[in-house]
């Protein structure tokens, strides 16, 4: 049987009697299971070396409850290769699109209690049209999936039963799949647009999946996703050319949870909540090295009553957690999280109804103390005041220091050890404990930390939420002096799965400066973003160097010549940087080691207007950083200049 025939047979649109005797032998009736309410099982016994199912058209919607599609039944699947639940064993069965065809969705689920397990899926996308299609994705969940394209004879909206919660598929489970990447763990030639779209589903479970290299988000919700559980997935390197956020929640999301995931190296936020109805819990996740293409907060919250707790959040070109001012966002509890290496506050509450572009991406910086009751209405989390220390230098005696200050009366103060250098704010590194502010707003805490340590605090008011952090205070010796403690050792960008081999032991010796004869730029044709053969050779050399030296990271700066508008050139420079990044991805360079920065026409090589000067302007520059803090010597090249 083909997969299409198996789905039709399960749905009842293909009858058993119409099958050939050979095909009938592949179908067995599970009477006890049917009596217990369980539906059909679809297993796989594909010939060795022929385990890729390439579609030329949409598969039938899954309409029968209780169906299980189990790719782990295919010979060759080894569950022992799963060393971490977030990195499932490599599936053997691949579901993709045949070359030269466009298929919008891999699987469309319109029934309850459906399980999809053990597949590799990629290639599901649609070309841009005058009227855009409904979301193309690996897996689409809805009571009745809308048509891919808009047509004059489409049924009315009521047919989709969006206003009937009981019609939504319930308890759909997506587990142990590789979504977006190939079986060889590489970027596909044709990436999928999205990973999983929960358009209209209740109590959906997405767990133990590896989700990488989608043009858009790995998980996105639509009209209804109440009770959604996203648990222990590896969500890496998504948003390459579209919606940049790893997880984007919209619509009805009450009682949803995002727990235990590795959310790493995505192009935007790790989690972005856009005008949701209901609240979610985000806890116990590693959210790091995101914002590869956009300067966004690691977690961006709209709405009220969300809880963000016990997460590790860091290495973000923006704030750690941002709470919007509009729509009204209150009572969001943001506690026991650990932050590192942020280009912004650990927690940023958008103030005074600010709705600029930056306010919906990364935050607006520290807020002044609340000066009016109106701030309760127009600022995130009711404008809970950040704590203020009585002084910003506290003397430590015998290894302890009494830290005092003020906050909103009755709030709970979470104190943090700030491990990084810099004033007046720093990432909240190590949680130290909690104290209570009295009715006058006074608080005190005894801390056991060495002289030179830096501390900060957050205030949480259950009626309004958690505040922004306090400015940093330093623990000093009795005479007011303090040493400058060394910052934490740099962390190499790493989103890779665990290795079964022990880590190599290196001889400890002072690193020597690198002297590399490595080109740091490539050039493009007029109004083009394709990689030329000459530029490809240069990129091959860059990729080989980055694979050899894992402590190198790179920013890809896109540039254009000055012709055309600033907006057009900004988009063109981004396309050029993306083309270079995608080429390096296909050569095996990890996405967490690269970041896109488009400059448009703002940084020309010279002010000349000759053909040669314009050719030099049309470039991507590679700005390398040695995470050991050493200088690197690079060279420019012009071997791939393209004169118009």
Regions found by a protein language model. Give the residues of each.
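N-terminal, post-signal-peptide segments of secreted/periplasmic proteins
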Residues: 1-168, 191, 314-316, 325, ...
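Short, aromatic- and glycine-rich surface loops/edge beta-strands on solvent-exposed regions
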Residues: 451-463
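Periplasmic peptidoglycan-binding/tethering modules of Gram-negative envelope proteins
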Residues: 480-553, 625-644
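Short glycine/acidic-rich loop motifs that flank beta-strands on beta-rich extracellular proteins
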Residues: 103-105, 125-132, 183-194, 215-221, ...
């Amino acid at each position: 049987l083909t997969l299409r025939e198996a789905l039709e047979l399960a749905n009842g649109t293909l009858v058993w009697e119409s099958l050939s005797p050979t095909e009938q032998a592949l179908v067995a009736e599970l009477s006890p299971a049917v009596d217990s309410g369980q539906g059909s099982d679809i297993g796989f016994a594909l010939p060795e070396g022929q385990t890729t199912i390439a579609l030329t058209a949409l598969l039938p919607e899954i309409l029968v409850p209780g169906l299980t599609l189990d790719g782990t039944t295919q010979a060759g699947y080894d569950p022992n290769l799963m060393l971490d639940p977030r990195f499932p064993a490599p599936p053997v069965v691949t579901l993709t699109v045949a070359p030269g065809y466009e298929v919008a969705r891999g699987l469309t689920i319109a029934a309850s209690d459906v399980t999809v397990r053990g597949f590799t899926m990629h290639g599901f996308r649609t070309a841009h049209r005058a009227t855009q299609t409904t979301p193309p994705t690996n897996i689409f969940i809805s009571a009745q999936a809308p048509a891919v394209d808009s047509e004059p004879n489409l049924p009315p909206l009521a047919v989709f039963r969006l206003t009937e919660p009981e019609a939504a598929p319930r308890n759909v489970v997506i587990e142990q799949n590789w979504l977006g990447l190939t079986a060889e763990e590489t970027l596909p030639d044709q990436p999928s647009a999205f990973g999983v779209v929960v358009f209209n589903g209740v109590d959906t479970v997405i767990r133990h999946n590896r989700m990488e290299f989608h043009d858009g988000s790995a998980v996105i919700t639509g009209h209804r996703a109440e009770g959604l559980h996203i648990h222990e997935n590896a969500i890496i390197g998504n948003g390459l050319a579209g919606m940049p956020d790893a997880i984007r929640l919209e619509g009805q999301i009450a009682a949803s949870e995002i727990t235990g995931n590795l959310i790493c190296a995505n192009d935007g936020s790790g989690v972005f909540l856009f005008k949701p109805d209901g609240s979610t819990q985000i806890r116990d996740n590693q959210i790091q090295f995101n914002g590869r293409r956009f300067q966004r907060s690691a977690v961006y919250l709209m709405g009220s009553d969300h809880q963000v707790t016990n997460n590790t959040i860091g290495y973000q070109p923006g704030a750690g957690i941002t709470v919007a001012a509009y729509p009204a966002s209150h009572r969001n509890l943001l506690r026991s999280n650990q932050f590192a290496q942020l280009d912004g506050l650990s927690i940023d509450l958008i103030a005074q109804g600010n709705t600029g572009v930056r306010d919906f991406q990364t935050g607006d910086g520290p807020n002044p103390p609340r000066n009016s009751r109106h701030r309760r209405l127009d600022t995130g989390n009711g404008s809970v005041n950040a704590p203020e220390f009585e002084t910003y230098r506290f003397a430590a005696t015998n290894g302890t220091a009494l830290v005092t200050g003020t906050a909103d009366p009755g709030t709970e103060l979470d104190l943090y050890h700030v491990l990084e250098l810099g004033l007046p704010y720093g990432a909240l590194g190590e949680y130290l404990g909690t104290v209570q502010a009295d009715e006058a707003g006074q608080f005190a805490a005894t801390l056991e930390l060495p002289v030179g340590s830096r501390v900060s605090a957050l205030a949480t008011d259950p009626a309004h939420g958690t505040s922004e952090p306090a400015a940093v205070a330093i623990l000093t010796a009795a005479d007011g002096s303090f040493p400058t403690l060394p910052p934490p050792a740099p962390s190499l960008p790493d989103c890779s799965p665990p290795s079964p081999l022990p880590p190599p032991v290196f001889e400890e010796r002072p690193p020597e400066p690198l002297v590399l004869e490595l080109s740091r730029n490539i050039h493009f044709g007029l109004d083009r973003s394709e990689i030329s053969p000459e530029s490809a050779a240069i990129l091959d050399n860059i990729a080989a160097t980055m694979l050899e030296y894992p402590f190198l990271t790179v920013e890809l700066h896109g540039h254009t010549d000055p012709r055309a508008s600033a907006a057009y050139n900004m988009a063109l420079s981004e396309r050029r940087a993306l083309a270079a990044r995608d080429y390096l991805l296909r050569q095996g360079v990890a996405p967490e080691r690269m970041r896109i920065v488009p400059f448009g026409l703002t940084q020309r090589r010279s002010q000349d207007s000759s053909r040669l000067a314009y050719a030099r302007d049309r470039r991507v520059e590679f700005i390398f950083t040695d995470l050991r803090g050493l200088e690197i010597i690079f060279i420019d090249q012009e071997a791939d200049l393209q004169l118009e």
